[in-house]
From Swiss-Prot:
This is Error-prone DNA polymerase. InterPro entries: DNA_pol3_alpha_NTPase_dom (IPR011708), DNA_pol3_finger (IPR040982), DnaE2 (IPR023073), DnaE2/DnaE/PolC (IPR004805), DNAPol_HHH (IPR029460), NA-bd_OB_tRNA (IPR004365), PHP_dom (IPR004013), Pol/His_phosphatase_N (IPR003141). DNA polymerase involved in damage-induced mutagenesis and translesion synthesis (TLS). It is not the major replicative DNA polymerase. Its main location: cytoplasm. It comes from Pseudomonas syringae pv. syringae (strain B728a). Keywords: Cytoplasm, DNA damage, DNA repair, DNA replication, DNA-directed DNA polymerase, Nucleotidyltransferase, Transferase. GO terms for molecular function: 3'-5' exonuclease activity; DNA-directed DNA polymerase activity; nucleic acid binding. SUPFAM superfamilies: PHP domain-like. Belongs to the DNA polymerase type-C family. DnaE2 subfamily. The keyword Cytoplasm applies.
């Protein structure tokens, strides 16, 4: 007799810290064993069901959608989806259960089954070891609701009493008139994952494996067993019943029906006609002189394709969100592939004029691609929440939710969880964590383990590392996407379960952005960008002090002084070109116009670097190499001197040279992005080569293009993205060049953001001769502000007054009370300040320690004394200042002030710490950053500086880039991999770092190639100088 079986009760690793295998592993194993179907029944979640659906499609083995859940004060049950109605019912049930509980938990109540949900089949999993009456009552309760849609699940796992258990379960089923079926309670695809499953169980229960006891399964039988093994335990009729149930479950995720909201369309209009009307209004605003024939044709082409694909409502929704932001004076800008669209530009979603660029609309939408477009919009990072709450208000929480992100285990974190439950002591776990790389999930080598004092051959360490390797990449929990929104015409809970986010007033769906693409749900990304906050604040400050109202659209273009500043790499604080790698490239590329900035933004990226495109481009730009490309491809290559730098160029080459359709070219782009992870690029090699040879191109050229495509890997940068970012790059550079005080002030008020700390931004401003005034309770507001100066140079006639936000641990509400009280009359002493601003002891002491009372009372020692006196008299206050005996206190030393500044403000307006150490350093023949400007190439020397940044790009072959700061400027240090590994503790842990190395000076770019590192942090005597690491 041919045995058949379908597993109806199986958990994937999306039953967090329970399931020990991925959906792909489960489906591949079930297919190998000859199963007829596989149900994925993760506990009260559908978070992994799209991945299971993909695994089902790739293997051809049918997927049954389901979920296991414990009913509060009731039975344990597995619900299986029979049809569309059942799927919607399951989504709603999970949503209700998750929404009524805390993050990561659920509560299913009996009332959730009143009335019984249609379209769901139920497997009852009775607890024979518990209360017999309660078990029987639970079965009766389920039978009353599910009737002929209920089965009793029989799980047998080589227990000592399996025969008796089978008899008891069958008797229970018969007594209630409920059919029985075999089910495996599967937690892993293979027996070999038992150790990992035990480990995850201990992690989940916050115990050790040794102490977990009955929490662990008795054996490894909860895996996908071969049919022969199953037949040893189950009668054939119990196995066959599983297949009959599976055949009833016909639902497929591909059948989901999704509609975008329609309420934005006025009466008498359709979504298509209304989108056209809004687009035409935008055309008149954007192009007051009228459209060129080419642009008109592009607009018509886009509108026709949008209507054909039924994306009109999506565009209307994004337009509505952008219009709300603008109505609230929230700066925003669309980016990414949407910048390829003339319609998006007309609607005000993007700011990139398609007439001034050569962008490819098919990168955004194509007829052949059966996927929705993806529009990303950046908003001011500290006002994005206003936009998010507007969306919730507009559509209701039932129809709008944020996308999830499946947070996964990484190297060190996975090891910590594993080692803890295997009983390693905390000090060993911490030491072992040091041996893990910060930059990859790879396990440490035996050599590295020995370096940190571990014997790689000890059994416990082998076990920890083996289990860690299995756990890396597993989902750990669902978290919230930075801003991906799904909005629906119908309640979202009919499409996907919705649960509470960790943040208040937010809900998330249980799928991530890749899941949404696969099932065809439209998403709009509401993203946060700190630079937009800084630009808007700069515009406001300039308007306040100059009377000039700038916008992104009205800033003067192609400004010579701005490009000269950029070419000097004087770009601290600006957008995108402020990193160490970008600043090293700027003097070599020397941008002169906007498109040069587009290339600059894109060229210092993994794709062009790995594709060996950077140096050929620079050589051609500098006249060191001939610019060559086939004449037929001039429209593709002329703007990048024959070197492909962008995804769109690869697509255009495929279309023009190899006869790809636009949709096929987009498939090439996707294969290019995924080939390193999933393969799939090789079929395009022959297709490209054959097409290009047929059209008269040289074989060498075809091969070179393909190798460059491979080099792009998953890092090919879209030109539309680079162009959108370049707009903000230019705006930030122009403002830094022409309004440096306002720009720096706005950056600090917008912090945290960007690459540099407020201290580094202020030091840069001082090097540019901007006057910085201290925090002073007599003048400072919460934010930093500008104060006029009598200076003939427009770029230097505004001083920055530091705000009370700079004082560590000081609260904004205290600052606002100071502003209100001060507006009535000036403060006269500490008592007056404390009384009228209603400051408690903590707030008053923070002001005194920071020096903010210097102008009102005197130096820090004096201020702290008077504040302490005010606190002693506080019970006697009667609204009148008190008189105190004057006490003479010593002035703080320069060093004491410096330490206090960094401790309380994170910066200093006094001498730079290195200035105080310069004599000591000079005695040891240390060079300063200023000295390096005049020294010849290949000189060996030592420097010392505060570490303000460490970077280790993924494309740098393990090289770490360190930026040091002294009183004159910055020193860029290159630390090769072997030195970084040998001196990792010094490299990562030093605040004041000495570097001995070789100076490399070429084309205006200077680096120090490190040969030895020394930690000089003790010389700082308590300064807390924080670097911005590994950005």
């Amino acid at each position: 007799m041919t045995r058949e079986y379908a597993e109806l009760h199986c958990l994937s690793n999306f039953s967090f810290q329970r399931g020990a295998s991925s959906a792909r592993e489960l489906f591949e194993r079930a297919l190998r064993h000859g199963y007829k179907a596989l149900a994925i029944t993760d506990e009260c979640t559908l978070a992994g069901i799209v991945r299971a659906w993909q695994a089902s499609k790739s293997t051809g083995l049918p997927l049954i959608v389901g979920s296991e859940m414990h009913i509060e004060n009731g039975p344990k049950v597995v619900l299986l989806v029979e049809n569309q109605a059942g799927y919607e019912a399951l989504c709603k049930l999970i949503t209700v259960a998750r929404r009524r509980a805390g993050k990561g938990e659920y509560r299913v109540l009996r009332e959730d089954f009143e009335p019984a949900p249609d379209g769901l089949l139920a497997l009852w999993l009775p607890d024979l070891d518990g209360n017999a009456q309660a078990c029987l009552a639970g079965g009766r309760w389920l039978r009353e609701r599910f009737a002929e849609r209920l089965w009793l699940g029989v799980g047998l796992h080589r227990g000592p009493d399996d025969e008796q258990r089978l008899a008891d379960l069958l008797a229970l089923a018969q007594s209630l008139g409920v059919p029985a079926v075999a089910s495996g309670d599967v937690h892993m695809h293979a027996r070999g994952r038992r150790a990992l499953q035990d480990t995850m169980t201990a992690i989940r229960h916050h115990t050790t494996v040794a102490e977990a006891g009955h929490l662990l399964f008795a054996n490894g039988e909860r895996h996908l067993r071969p049919l022969d093994a199953l037949s040893e335990h189950y009668p054939d009729w119990l196995l066959a019943e599983s297949v009959r149930i599976a055949r009833r479950c016909t639902f497929d995720l591909g059948d989901l029906k999704y509609e975008y909201p329609h309420e934005l369309v006025p009466k008498g209009q359709t979504s298509t006609s209304w989108l056209r009307e809004l687009t035409e209004r935008g055309v008149r605003r954007r192009w007051p002189g009228g459209l060129t024939p080419a642009t008109r044709a592009q607009v018509e082409k886009e509108l026709a394709l949008i209507a054909e694909k039924k994306f009109d409502s999506y565009f209307l929704t994004v337009h509505d969100i952008v219009e709300f932001a603008r109505s609230q004076h929230i700066l925003c800008q669309g980016r990414g592939s949407a910048a390829n669209s003339a319609v998006c530009y007309a609607l005000g979603i993007t700011e990139l004029n398609p007439e001034q660029s050569n962008l490819l609309f098919e990168r955004f939408i194509s007829r052949e691609r059966n996927e929705p477009p993806d529009i990303d919009v950046d908003f001011e990072h500290d006002r994005r929440e206003e936009v998010i709450q507007y969306i919730f208000r507009r559509y209701g929480r039932g129809r709008a939710a944020l996308t999830a992100v499946a947070s996964t285990y990484h190297g060190s974190g996975a090891m910590r969880d594993v080692a803890k439950v295997l009983g390693l002591p905390p000090e060993q776990i911490n030491a072992l964590a040091e041996a893990f790389s910060r930059w990859s999930d790879s396990l440490p080598s035996p050599e590295r383990l020995r370096e940190y004092g571990f014997d790689a051959d000890t059994p416990i360490l082998k076990r920890v590392l083996a289990l860690t390797g299995e756990l890396i990449g597993f989902p750990r929990h669902l978290s919230q996407h930075p801003g991906g929104f799904v909005i629906s015409e119908h309640p979202l809970e009919t499409l996907v379960p919705v649960e509470n986010a960790a943040m208040a007033d937010r809900t998330i769906i249980q799928w991530d952005k890749d899941d949404l693409d696969l099932v065809g749900l439209l998403k709009v990304d509401i993203l946060a960008l700190g630079m937009l906050s800084a630009l808007r604040r700069t515009f406001d400050l300039v308007h306040l002090h100059r009377g000039q109202r700038w916008t992104l659209a009205t800033l003067p273009g192609d400004d010579r002084k701005t490009y000269e500043m950029i070419s000097r790499a004087d770009t601290i604080g600006v957008f995108q070109i402020e990193s160490r790698a970008q600043m090293a490239m700027l003097p070599r590329l020397r941008p002169e116009k906007f498109y040069d900035l587009v290339i600059e933004v894109a060229i210092v990226r993994p794709g062009p670097i790995q594709g060996d495109m950077v140096h050929p481009y620079l050589r051609r730009r500098n006249g060191e190499e001939d610019v060559t490309y086939p004449p037929k491809l001039e429209s593709v290559f002329k703007r990048t001197l024959g070197v492909p730098l962008f995804q769109e160029q690869v697509m255009e080459v495929a279309i023009l040279a190899a006869d790809y359709t636009p949709g096929e070219a987009d498939e090439l782009r996707r294969a290019m992005a995924a080939w390193k992870r999933h393969g799939g690029l090789e079929p395009h090699r022959e297709r490209l080569r054959t097409g290009m040879l047929k059209n008269g191109y040289e074989a060498d050229f075809a091969d070179r293009i393909f190798e460059q495509i491979k080099g792009f890997g998953s890092y090919g940068f879209p030109e539309s993205h680079a162009a959108s970012f370049a707009l903000l790059t230019y705006a930030s550079c122009w403002l830094k060049c022409h309004e440096p005080a306002a720009f720096t002030c706005a950056l600090i008020n917008s912090w945290p953001m960007g690459f540099y700390s407020p201290d580094q931004l202020l030091q840069d401003a001082r090097r540019h001769h901007i006057e910085i005034r201290p925090v002073d309770v007599r003048y400072s507001d919460w934010d930093c502000s500008l104060e006029p100066l009598d200076h003939p140079d427009r770029t230097r006639n505004l001083a920055i007054r530091l705000g009370l936000r700079m004082v560590r641990s000081f609260r904004e509400e205290d600052a606002l009370r100071i502003e209100v009280a001060r507006a009535k009359r000036p403060f006269v002493d500490a008592t007056d300040l404390t009384l009228r601003a209603e400051l408690d002891a903590r707030a008053a002491e923070a002001l005194a320690d920071s020096g903010a009372l210097r102008g009102l009372i005197g130096h820090r020692h004096r201020a702290r004394w008077e504040v302490a006196g005010v606190e002693a008299q506080r019970p006697l206050f009667d609204d009148l200042p008190s008189e105190e005996t004057q006490v003479t206190l010593p002035l703080p030393t320069v060093a004491e002030d410096l330490v206090a500044d960094y401790t309380t403000l994170g910066t200093t307006l006094g001498p730079h710490p290195l200035a105080l150490l310069r004599r000591q350093l000079a005695a040891k023949r240390f060079r300063s950053s200023q000295d390096l400007l005049h020294l010849e190439n290949d000189r060996t020397l030592s420097v010392a500086g505060l570490v303000i940044g460490r970077q280790r790009p993924g494309t740098a072959s393990g090289v770490t880039f360190v930026t040091l700061e002294d009183e004159f400027g910055m020193v860029n240090v290159v630390v090769w991999r072997d030195l970084a590994e040998r001196q990792r503790k010094v490299l990562v842990g030093s605040q004041l770092l000495q570097v001995f190395g070789r100076l490399e000076s070429k084309s205006g770019v200077r680096h120090l190639i490190a040969q030895r590192l020394y930690d000089l942090t003790p010389l700082l005597t308590g300064l807390d100088v924080r670097s911005r690491d590994f950005q």
